[in-house]
UniProtKB/Swiss-Prot annotation:
Domain of life per record: Bacteria
Recorded GO MF terms: nicotinate-nucleotide-dimethylbenzimidazole phosphoribosyltransferase activity
Swiss-Prot/TrEMBL keywords: Cobalamin biosynthesis, Glycosyltransferase, Transferase
Organism annotation: Shewanella putrefaciens (strain CN-32 / ATCC BAA-453)
Protein's name according to its UniProt entry: Nicotinate-nucleotide--dimethylbenzimidazole phosphoribosyltransferase
Top-level EC class as recorded in UniProt: transferase
Transmembrane segments: none
GO biological process: cobalamin biosynthetic process
Enzyme Commission number(s) from the entry: 2.4.2.21
Cited function: Catalyzes the synthesis of alpha-ribazole-5'-phosphate from nicotinate mononucleotide (NAMN) and 5,6-dimethylbenzimidazole (DMB).
UniProt similarity note: Belongs to the CobT family.
């Protein structure tokens, strides 16, 4: 363990009020379970907040960006330069995530965790660089173990700033050419799966590129096999700067009893690491959607997660998490505002 190791103290969400919360849901003017997954979501949120009137305040979308050494081997449909171009697009408001955040009321913040070349003089990009792209994981570790802890510390400070500003819900998105390779490698290492069960086509690669991607990830796992002794070591050997900071931010948000909305395949890989580090994190995670990346369903099942949406998305950026916000708000609103049978003078049908 590095001398500057960062640790998190995350409480398990109390079940003391669970029966009362469930009773309140059951007594709304509807048949039992008629609001489906919104009911379990309302129960989760009310348990996390421990409040009679749960609420969403200053919802914030954090998009973490970083480049990957493995991308130089052509494992994606786009070169690494596109990461930087998309980060600029985020800053100028032109990406899908910008459109959706404006629509649903998310504050959007973009974090440069380590793209190849920094973007200077552009408002709206937070500098939390850990380097200029990771090492190529099939040849060397992605980063030093100390860099993982540095990323965790940066992420904790980021979350603390938003918590102090009154945010109680944070969603996670990402941008990084090659990061499905890193996420697949992390998944294979932690879940002890064959690489072929973890690797998909990312943003739409062809069969030849997929075969190369599979081979390189298998090489990476073989190269680092003896070093993969824990979740931080998995991040150091196989991860990305953006995945490291997402993981740390999820841990920090759970530590502050915030709601954590997880986007797609890459964000779920970060959640997988976070839960491996601190299992209590799982109580705070809301999984926005099931993406079209083939390994995502396996990860969701491993985490016993039922996502809110299944739209065939495979873009990343936090787009699925943004689209889930109205559903999260609907769960809170029905819990707070919907009449009970006694309030409405209706004979109970429970």
């Amino acid at each position: 363990m590095s001398q500057s190791a960062v640790s998190f103290q995350i409480n398990s969400v109390s079940k003391v009020q669970e029966q009362l919360i469930q009773q309140k849901i059951n007594l709304k003017t509807k048949p039992l379970g008629a609001l489906g997954q919104l009911e379990s979501l309302a129960l989760q949120i009310a348990r996390i907040q421990g409040a009679d009137q749960p609420y969403i305040a200053n919802p914030t979308m954090l998009v973490f960006a970083g480049d990957h050494g493995i991308a130089a081997e052509g494992v994606s449909i786009a070169p690494s330069e596109v990461t930087r171009q998309m980060v600029q697009n985020f800053a100028h408001g032109g990406a899908a995530i910008n459109v959706f955040c404006r629509q649903v009321g998310f504050k959007l913040e973009v974090i440069d965790c380590g793209i190849l070349t920094p973007i200077e003089g552009v408002k709206g990009i937070i500098d939390q660089r850990l380097g200029a792209g990771t090492g190529a994981i099939h040849l060397e570790p992605a980063m030093a173990l100390e860099t993982v802890d540095k990323g965790f510390a940066m992420a904790r400070d980021l979350i603390e700033r938003h918590h102090q500003a009154g945010c109680n819900l944070v969603a996670f998105g990402e941008m990084g050419i090659g990061n499905t390779s890193a996420a697949s490698a992390i998944m294979a290492a932690i879940m002890q799966l064959d690489v072929i069960d973890c690797v998909g086509r990312g943003t739409g690669i062809n069969q030849e590129t997929l075969a190369r991607k599979l081979m390189l990830i298998e090489l990476a796992l073989l190269l680092h096999q003896s070093a993969l002794t824990g979740p931080k070591e998995v991040l150091a050997c196989l991860g990305g700067f953006e995945i490291v900071q997402m993981t740390g931010a999820m841990l920090a948000a759970a530590e502050r009893n915030m709601l954590v909305v997880v986007d797609g395949f890459i964000a779920t890989a970060a959640a997988l690491v976070a839960v491996t580090i601190a299992p209590n994190v799982r109580d705070y995670l809301i999984f926005a959607h099931q993406s079209d990346e083939q390994g995502h369903l396996r990860m969701l099942e491993f985490l016993q997660a039922k996502p809110l949406l299944s739209l065939g998305l495979r873009l990343g950026e936090g787009t699925g998490a943004a689209l889930a916000l109205p559903l999260i708000q609907a769960a809170v609103n029905f819990y707070n505002q919907m009449a009970s049978f006694s309030d409405a003078g209706i004979e109970a049908v429970v």
